[in-house]
Amino acid sequence: MNEDTPPFYFISVCDNFRDNTAEHVFDMLIERHSSFENYPIENTAFINSLIVNGFKYNQVDDHVVCEYCEAEIKNWSEDECIEYAHVTLSPYCAYANKIAERESFGDNITINAVLVKEGKPKCVYRCMSNLQSRMDTFVNFWPAALRDMITNIAEAGLFYTGRGDETVCFFCDCCVRDWHTNEDTWQRHAAENPQCYFVLSVKGKEFCQNSITVTHVDKRDDDNLNENADDIEEKYECKVCLERQRDAVLMPCRHFCVCVQCYFGLDQKCPTCRQDVTDFIKIFVV
């Protein structure tokens, strides 16, 4: 393939991915470009498109790996719609979703590529994974008329950018703006990105797809709750926030001690045993 460095238009495609400076993005593109030296498909335009879409060659057949979500994909055809294949085969990839926002996919697109290794959803802004960190971003410039919504917006995984009423998800990087008083913040987030791993983990797939009606019950307004129900609620309250019910079993230690929302704010250590946490299983207490 061509030895030249990637054309500069790559930067304009990628520099809005907020977690990287333009200089760092360019360095990543150069590194990805170099990895395709011995790629079996010699179509330069196709290779450039793979690079733009976050892929590097892993030196096995025609397998490529996304630098952001680590999904591994093979069996490409030169007429493949790479953007569509990436976001379809790895729907949690924040980078693939950001590029797909700019695309208009037609109907009946055929995907020839095959997923070898599933991608892992990655948090874009780890520093904002803690609820209080997100709350703190609303201190300055947030519109006074929307001040009562700050807690709900932050709990839905969003932090304030300092511009108008623009908020961004700490996990998937989607942008939510033009808020109205008393809006359902979770529904707005899910509407912007129904594939957000944080929203899916907390609210469930059905909620994100708007296929069922979700009813929120506030126990403070429910006069029918008895003392026994209150005892159960206290028994299973999250050990971190002391407010929500536990619904996450931490892996691999299997301690049942936090809610899913607080799981995303952990320092990757179980609060009970301090063992490294690699994943969680969501459960429902009935």
From Swiss-Prot:
GO biological process, one term: symbiont-mediated perturbation of host apoptosis
Keyword Electron transport: no
UniProt keyword Zinc-finger, yes or no: yes
Annotated Zn(2+) binding sites: C169, C172, H189, C196
Database matches in InterPro entries: BIR_rpt (IPR001370), IAP (IPR050784), Znf_RING (IPR001841), Znf_RING/FYVE/PHD (IPR013083)
Highest taxon of the lineage: Viruses
Disulfide bridge positions per record: none
BIR repeat residues: 29-96, 131-199
SMART domains: BIR, RING
Keywords: Apoptosis, Host-virus interaction, Metal-binding, Modulation of host cell apoptosis by virus, Repeat, Zinc, Zinc-finger
Pfam short name (any one): zf-C3HC4_3
GO-annotated molecular function: zinc ion binding
Zinc fingers classed as RING-type: ranges: 238-274
Biological role: Acts by blocking cellular apoptosis early in infection. Later, stimulates caspase-3-like protease activity and induces apoptosis, probably to favor the release of occluded virions.
Protein name: Apoptosis inhibitor 1
Organism: Autographa californica nuclear polyhedrosis virus
